[in-house]
């Protein structure tokens, strides 16, 4: 195949479209049967199907695909499943918007159907993007959490954990979003610093400071520090709450900070978690002043029906009018927000379903898992250490997995579904047996499960839990973002331990977030959002994947920059040019020829390259084993561009175009081995490009090939040292030609090399010169031939007379000026007057004479190169 038969420009869109059509995706399928290969199951994150497979998703899936493709090549039976985490509030809100309804205006089943239809369409859109990016997903193991085949497992896990006493139902303070009208877990609370006011209020015996005056209606005690002498005389006495009139006790507790505000604080039900702690500790009464919609209740008296903000404003005004409010000060406060809608959360006491948390067991399991990077484990440890409440798993929504529970109307007992009844929606089907009290009348549980109850069993699902297959837990790896360590990672470990008593995975690899070109988190409001489709349309999927590979080390945040994609696209063209050149010289040379080739006919520079190539394979293997994608790809790119293209190809052109068949054969062998190996090394990262290269070398897919093995016999330090010297000598000769304005292929009469025992053939070809290795030391005579005045010194000193000084210098012989300079001063006559100059005022150009010839001399790492022009 000649260069003219291969297009000069690499057409990425054409190549990628071709292979998307040609690839048989069954080559990515996991074998559930007996298989001699070790399993490698990936607990893939199931994204929320918004219809937009955003760039953060795409980066994570690049990482997953790098691993999946690499592990297949390493001989593993790989499962790269694809899941979709369907349930949740955003879909409900979108359905209401699309259909112009609220969820309560249509039957529950009809609303769920609308949600399912929207979700199915969104999944189709996202699936197309994933295919376009070349992800080697095992679509035979796709799962969709809203499908009965999946949520039956969610329900089954609930039933088993309930029967094992992991799950319970009781009224308890919970985080509540008034806008979403649902409970949320602590892991779903995000915090933001906001400005508020600290209000100073007279009570009848003490003054308190509060940021929540609207909660005075729910004040059940006042607390001070026992060491605070200002209030010690009042501890145990009753105090009347202004405006609302209830009498509360003043208690002493060590958690009160005397320096904050007045040193006296209200205990309300509930302003924050500290209120809950005190409420439990002192068995205080419960006053519900805020309802589920964020409105004030009857307990607030005349403020009933007001929103929280309206009530706060009204109470402050009334306190001021009555003379109770005596000061207000600005305060920065960390406010807990709902992760979905950014509404400040409230803590309400509501009956909910909870999962018990065993912090010690979770920490022990986390220690059994290998974390990449290791420091990310600290995030899980820190989060676990702050857990005070059990996991609230019930939600007051519709589009989610139904809780398989009924409540007996007669005795109030809970009826939990039997596993054989599942999947089931208790709002659509009654229990298949009577209650223990004999009653057959039940109230269905209308709450649904937290979506994390669906996604926290993905590790179980993909390893065959409750299926026709044998359980293969633990999975080998969980790839995920650092933002969901406290949710998805935490809950998955909890559930795996509760249901199977095992860790969910052997390893967890954490990826960072994608930042916009401006360095900020991508958001529509900032106008810095880039979609994967935008990149693939403008450049290519392989260019996008390269950006993902080199953007940052594992766990770090990655900035999207167009210049990185441009650089990636240039590398594809560079590799294509390397391949095009190589293939033009491999006509008639294939795998059979490579197998028959006798390696003892290799030149030093061939051994140098093959040694470097095998070191590259060794490095890439070790780095990928540690999920270091950036360093792996940079090493491959550096080898291809700097070692192969910039040096080896230039050095062997003489042999490839020459008439030495044995030397040419050796170069062909190296080109074949190197091109094929690079195709394999690039396959996990840029699968379309690698397939295009490999298809010209083999009828098989590169993605069904084994990862290249390191040939230790070809790693040769002596060859590398000699090759480096050859490379550097050739580089210096090329630089020499460039500085003289010569063409790089311009002929030189001869190169004489001293102090080097190297193969000169490839230097001769690259330099277009005869080359001789010389014995002994070179003998040089340096003859001064020109005096160059330093006008930087002469100009400022002599000004208008500088020309006369230059003329006087030129009148002297270069040898005479050199001799004077050696003595420390130079004297010249200008208009009959002697002028003294420092040696730095001139530069003496010398010619090098060797053997009676004018030559140029280069020194390269101890070797001396004499150039005869």
Swiss-Prot record:
CDD domains per the UniProt record, alphabetical: Anticodon_Ia_Val (cd07962), ValRS_core (cd00817)
Binding site for ATP: 524
A GO BP annotation: valyl-tRNA aminoacylation
Alphabetically ordered keywords of this record: Aminoacyl-tRNA synthetase, ATP-binding, Cytoplasm, Ligase, Nucleotide-binding, Protein biosynthesis
Location(s) in or outside the cell: Cytoplasm
Pfam families documented for this protein: Anticodon_1, DUF5915, tRNA-synt_1
Alphabetized SUPFAM superfamilies for the sequence: Anticodon-binding domain of a subclass of class I aminoacyl-tRNA synthetases, Nucleotidylyl transferase, ValRS/IleRS/LeuRS editing domain
InterPro entries assigned to the protein according to its UniProt record, in alphabetical order: aa-tRNA-synth_I_CS, aa-tRNA-synth_Ia, Anticodon_Ia_Val, M/V/L/I-tRNA-synth_anticd-bd, Rossmann-like_a/b/a_fold, tRNAsynth_Ia_anticodon-bd, Val/Leu/Ile-tRNA-synth_edit, Valine-tRNA_ligase_type_2
GO cellular component, one term: cytosol
GO terms, molecular function: aminoacyl-tRNA deacylase activity; ATP binding; valine-tRNA ligase activity
EC id: 6.1.1.9
Positions occupied by motif 'KMSKS' region: 521-525
Catalytic activities: tRNA(Val) + L-valine + ATP = L-valyl-tRNA(Val) + AMP + diphosphate
Coiled-coil ranges per UniProt: none
Motif 'HIGH' region location, chain numbering: 47-57
Function summary: Catalyzes the attachment of valine to tRNA(Val). As ValRS can inadvertently accommodate and process structurally similar amino acids such as threonine, to avoid such errors, it has a 'posttransfer' editing activity that hydrolyzes mischarged Thr-tRNA(Val) in a tRNA-dependent manner.
PANTHER family (UniProt xref): VALINE--TRNA LIGASE, CHLOROPLASTIC_MITOCHONDRIAL 2, VALYL-TRNA SYNTHETASES
Domain notes: ValRS has two distinct active sites: one for aminoacylation and one for editing. The misactivated threonine is translocated from the active site to the editing site.
Family stated for the protein in its record: Belongs to the class-I aminoacyl-tRNA synthetase family. ValS type 2 subfamily.
Name of protein: Valine--tRNA ligase
Native source organism of the sequence: Methanosarcina barkeri (strain Fusaro / DSM 804)
Gene: valS
């Amino acid at each position: 195949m000649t260069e003219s038969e291969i297009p000069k420009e690499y057409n990425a869109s054409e190549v990628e479209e071709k292979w998307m059509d040609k690839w048989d995706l069954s080559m990515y399928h996991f074998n559930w049967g007996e298989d001699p290969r070790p399993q490698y199951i990936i607990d893939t994150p199931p994204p929320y199907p918004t219809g937009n497979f955003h760039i953060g998703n795409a980066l994570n899936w690049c990482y997953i695909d790098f691993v999946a493709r690499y592990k297949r090549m390493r001989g593993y039976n790989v499962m790269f499943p694809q899941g979709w985490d369907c349930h949740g509030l955003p879909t409900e809100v979108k359905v209401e918007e699309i259909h112009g309804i609220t969820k309560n205006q249509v039957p529950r089943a009809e609303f769920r159907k609308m949600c399912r239809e929207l979700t199915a369409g969104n999944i189709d859109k996202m699936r197309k993007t994933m295919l376009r990016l070349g992800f080697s997903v095992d679509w035979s193991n796709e799962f969709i959490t809203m499908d009965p085949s999946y949520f039956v497992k969610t329900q089954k896990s609930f039933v088993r954990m309930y029967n094992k006493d992991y799950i319970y139902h009781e009224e308890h303070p919970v985080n509540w979003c008034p806008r979403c009208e649902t409970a949320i877990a602590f892991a779903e609370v995000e915090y933001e610093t906001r400005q508020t006011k600290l209000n100073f209020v007279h009570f009848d015996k003490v003054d308190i400071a509060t940021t929540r005056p609207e909660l005075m209606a729910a004040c059940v005690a006042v607390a001070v520090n026992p060491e605070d002498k200002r209030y010690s005389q009042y501890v145990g006495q009753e105090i009347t709450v202004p405006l609302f009139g209830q009498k509360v006790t003043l208690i002493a507790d060590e958690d009160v900070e005397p320096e904050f505000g007045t040193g006296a604080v209200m205990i309300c039900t509930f302003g924050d978690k500290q209120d809950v702690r005190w409420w439990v500790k002192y068995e205080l009464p419960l006053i519900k002043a805020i309802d589920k919609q964020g409105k004030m209740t009857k307990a607030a008296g005349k403020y009933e029906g007001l929103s929280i903000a309206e009530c706060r404003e009204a109470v402050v005004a009334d306190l001021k009018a009555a003379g109770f409010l005596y000061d207000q000060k600005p305060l920065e406060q960390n406010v807990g927000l709902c992760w979905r809608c950014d509404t400040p959360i409230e803590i309400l006491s509501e009956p909910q379903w909870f999962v018990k948390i065993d912090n010690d067991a979770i920490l022990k399991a986390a220690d059994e898992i290998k974390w990449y990077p290791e420091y990310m484990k600290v995030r899980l440890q820190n989060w676990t250490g702050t857990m005070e409440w059990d996991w609230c798993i019930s939600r007051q929504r519709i589009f989610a997995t139904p809780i398989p529970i009924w409540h007996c109307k007669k005795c109030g007992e809970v009826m939990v579904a039997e596993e054989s009844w599942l999947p089931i929606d208790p709002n659509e089907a009654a229990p298949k047996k009577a209650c223990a009290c004999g009653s057959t009348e039940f109230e269905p549980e209308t709450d649904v499960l937290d979506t994390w109850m669906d996604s926290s069993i993905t590790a179980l699902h993909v390893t065959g839990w409750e299926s026709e297959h044998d359980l293969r837990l633990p999975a080998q790896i969980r790839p995920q973002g650092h933002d969901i360590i406290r949710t998805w990672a935490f809950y998955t470990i909890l559930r795996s331990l509760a249901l199977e008593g095992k860790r969910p995975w052997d390893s967890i690899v954490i990826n960072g977030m994608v930042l916009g070109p401006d360095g900020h988190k991508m958001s529509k409001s900032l106008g810095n959002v880039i979609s994967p489709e935008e990149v693939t349309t403008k450049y290519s999927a392989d260019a996008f994947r390269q950006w993902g590979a080199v953007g940052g080390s594992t766990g770090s945040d990655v900035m999207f920059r167009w210049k990185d994609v441009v650089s990636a696209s240039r590398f594809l063209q560079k590799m294509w040019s390397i391949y095009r050149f190589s293939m033009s010289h491999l006509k008639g040379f294939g795998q059979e020829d490579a197998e028959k080739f006798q390696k003892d006919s290799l030149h030093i520079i061939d051994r140098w390259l093959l040694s470097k190539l095998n070191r590259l394979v060794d490095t890439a293997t070790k780095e990928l084993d540690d999920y270091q994608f950036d360093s792996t790809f940079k090493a491959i790119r550096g080898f291809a561009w700097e070692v192969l293209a910039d040096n080896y190809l230039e050095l062997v052109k003489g042999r490839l175009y020459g008439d030495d068949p044995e030397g040419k054969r050796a170069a062909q062998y190296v080109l074949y081995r190197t091109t094929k190996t690079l195709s394999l090394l690039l396959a996990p990262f840029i699968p379309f490009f690698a397939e295009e290269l490999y298809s010209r070398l083999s009828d098989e897919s590169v993605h069904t090939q084994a990862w290249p093995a390191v040939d230790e016999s070809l790693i040769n330090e002596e060859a590398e040292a000699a090759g480096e010297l050859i490379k550097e000598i050739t580089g210096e000769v090329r630089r020499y030609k460039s500085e003289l304005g010569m063409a790089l292929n311009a002929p030189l009469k001869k190169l004489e090399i001293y102090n080097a025992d190297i193969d000169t053939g490839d230097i001769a070809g690259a330099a277009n010169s005869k080359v001789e290795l010389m014995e002994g030391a070179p003998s040089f005579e340096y003859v001064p031939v020109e005096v160059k005045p330093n006008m930087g010194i002469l100009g400022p000193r002599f000004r208008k007379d500088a020309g006369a000084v230059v003329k006087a210098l030129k009148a002297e012989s270069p040898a005479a000026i050199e001799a004077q300079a050696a003595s420390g001063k130079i004297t010249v006559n200008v208009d009959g007057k002697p002028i003294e100059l420092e040696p730095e005022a001139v530069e003496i150009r010398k010619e090098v004479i060797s053997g009676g010839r004018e030559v140029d001399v280069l020194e390269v790492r101890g070797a001396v190169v004499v150039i005869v022009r």
